[in-house]
Amino acid sequence: MTLAAQPILLTPGPLTTSDTTRDAMLRDWGSWDSDFNAITARLRERLLQIVHGEGTHECVPLQGSGTFSVEAAIGTLVPRDGHVLVPNNGAYCQRIAKICRVLGRQLTTIDYSEDRRVDPADVERALAADPTITHVALVHCETGAGVLNPLHDIAQVVAKHGRALIVDAMSSFGAIDIDARTTPFDAVIAASGKCLEGVPGLGFVIAKRSTLERCEGNSHSLAMDLYDQWVYMQRTTQWRFTPPTHVVAALDAAVGQYVDEGGLAARGGRYQRNYRALIDGMLALGFRPFLDPAIQAPIIVTFHAPDDPNYDFKRFYQEVKKRGYILYPGKLTEVETFRVGCIGHFGEAGIPGAVAAIADTLRAMGVRRVSAEAAA
């Protein structure tokens, strides 16, 4: 199936990929072959370059979804007697908190509503009040609603108090600036199937080398031991266990295209244009964004569901899908919403086309009142 014949995925990942990326998966690789090891080495180096971490940090890839790498990072980088502070403003923050509980790491949360970003002053107060906290685990872009948390300011607070910072950058890495030279962090976690526009199945942790060196024996798991994974890769250039060879090759191809496009500035700029086109188009239809624009990431946008008795998300989803676009359900606890992603490999006509498909779907469903405010 050609790219033109496929639906456009307006989701936070998996997302629409290029023909070049998918073509990279047509070749089979031996997992211990020197050519494949060279791909892994090149990929690790390029991922480090995106955050300017060469010389100070190490990139440790890991099989599985991004959550595998989040759990591996918490389990490896936080000692078993460590204490993790999790600022919580959404579903993916809550997932980190659950990981801490499952792994038996002491946990403290700062809880916010889903339409607020993390306040660095709250982190400051929590660290000042409790010297037993050893780590802060922050979600950079909380994909539940699309909130962009102030990473740089929080990193400065954490560094000031001499604690370690672990950043879940799943939905920001490669599109929103993270610079290891100016934003101190112990680890940044991301994955293949997000803003780098690879396919899902591979996560990676970019960790400060001096931090990794102190992590032997921390992990609860053999397969998720980042320290052991890193040491083995450094010694042999190979993966400890069978890697997802096709996914690695696809991500290598995707990162090559990322570099050719112009790197972070170009990728982030494209997503920002998609975001503006989406907001303008949906406002014209009467939809209300869930978030204040000041805290909205240009990655995924949450909209209030239509306030109309004819609206049903399942039918809405299927009708938009028939018109060539895949949306995403809301992930909020108390408000009925749906989400539209701004990321993926598609042209500038993609977002206006999606807005037109949504408008056509509303007409087909007989939805006349998109929001209470619009009707008033």
From Swiss-Prot:
One annotated GO biological process: organic phosphonate catabolic process
Chain positions found as N6-(pyridoxal phosphate)lysine: K194
Keywords: Aminotransferase, Pyridoxal phosphate, Pyruvate, Transferase
Reaction equation(s) it catalyzes: (2-aminoethyl)phosphonate + pyruvate = phosphonoacetaldehyde + L-alanine
A Gene Ontology molecular function term of the record: 2-aminoethylphosphonate-pyruvate transaminase activity
Record-linked Pfam families: Aminotran_5 (PF00266)
Superkingdom of source: Bacteria
EC number: 2.6.1.37
Cofactor: pyridoxal 5'-phosphate
NCBIfam families named among the record's database cross-references: PhnW-AepZ, PRK13479.1, transamin_PhnW
Function: Involved in phosphonate degradation.
Family: Belongs to the class-V pyridoxal-phosphate-dependent aminotransferase family. PhnW subfamily.
Record text on subunit structure and interactions: Homodimer.
Protein name: 2-aminoethylphosphonate--pyruvate transaminase 2
Organism, scientific name: Burkholderia lata (strain ATCC 17760 / DSM 23089 / LMG 22485 / NCIMB 9086 / R18194 / 383)
Underlying gene: phnW2
